[in-house]
Regions:
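Extracytoplasmic electron-transfer domains, predominantly the class I c-type cytochrome c fold
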Residues: 120-175
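Short, flexible loop/turn segments with low-complexity composition
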Residues: 182-192
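N-terminal start-of-chain detector that recognizes signal peptides
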Residues: 56-58, 76-78, 99-104, 126-128, ...
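A ubiquitous short alpha-helical element
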Residues: 63-66, 112, 133
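Periplasmic c-type cytochrome electron-transfer domains
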Residues: 4, 11-93, 97, 117, ...
Length: 199
């Protein structure tokens, strides 16, 4: 009668040893895949298969990595950052002049016509009179002007402009679409940066 109550273990249940083997094999497969991808990436870079030309279309991966890294860095570095320069016509006019001297060659004047260099940049330089950054916090514009953006034509002005002058540029950019009359008159005086197309 004892044999009637005996139960047998299902043969499909994994033992601890089999489970550990499965996990080890799975991890080994992941490591192998990572090594293969790293080697493929190295070969692609070494053989020139990764585009390095400024007029080449970036891959989706490159665009994602660049935008994600930039946005994360700006968000991290601008927390609690506020413009110490008081808004005034005088400070805005200084901002206009600083923009004209340092930025207009790439980002245009009030006519929003791009210069020849601006049309050849990767990424194409936005013409701020029409593709403005008025919606951005001043701290974001300050960060971009001060630090630049890697792998683009946007340079850093850390060594050439004082922080207070960068803040004046940021203030001007923030108010570009609603400038006081005296400031707008100065803005309209900035010479066009428009380039000449090839003949």
């Amino acid at each position: 009668m004892a044999e009637l109550h005996a139960t047998s273990e299902p043969t499909t249940i994994l033992t601890d040893q089999m489970l550990m083997r499965f996990i080890a094999s799975f991890l080994a497969g992941i490591i192998f895949a990572i090594v293969v991808l790293a080697c493929a990436g190295f070969v692609a870079v070494e053989t020139g298969s990764v585009p390095a030309n400024a007029d080449g279309k970036p891959s989706a991966l490159e665009e994602w990595a660049a935008k994600t890294a930039l946005n994360a860095a700006i968000e991290r570095d601008t927390k609690g950052l506020t413009n110490p320069i008081q808004p005034s016509d005088e400070n805005l006019i200084i901002g206009v002049h600083l923009y004209a001297e340092n930025c207009a060659i790439c980002h245009g004047a009030s006519d929003a016509k791009p210069s020849n260099p601006a049309q050849g940049f990767y990424i194409e330089a936005p013409q701020l009179a029409k593709d403005g950054v008025e919606d951005d916090p001043e701290a974001v514009s300050f960060w971009i002007v001060k630090h630049g953006i890697r792998f683009t034509a946007m340079p850093s002005f850390t060594t050439t402009l004082k922080d207070e002058d960068i803040w004046r540029i940021a203030m001007f950019l923030k108010q570009m679409d609603k400038l006081p009359p005296a400031v707008d008159a100065e803005w309209k005086k900035v010479p066009s940066a428009a380039g000449t197309p090839p003949k």
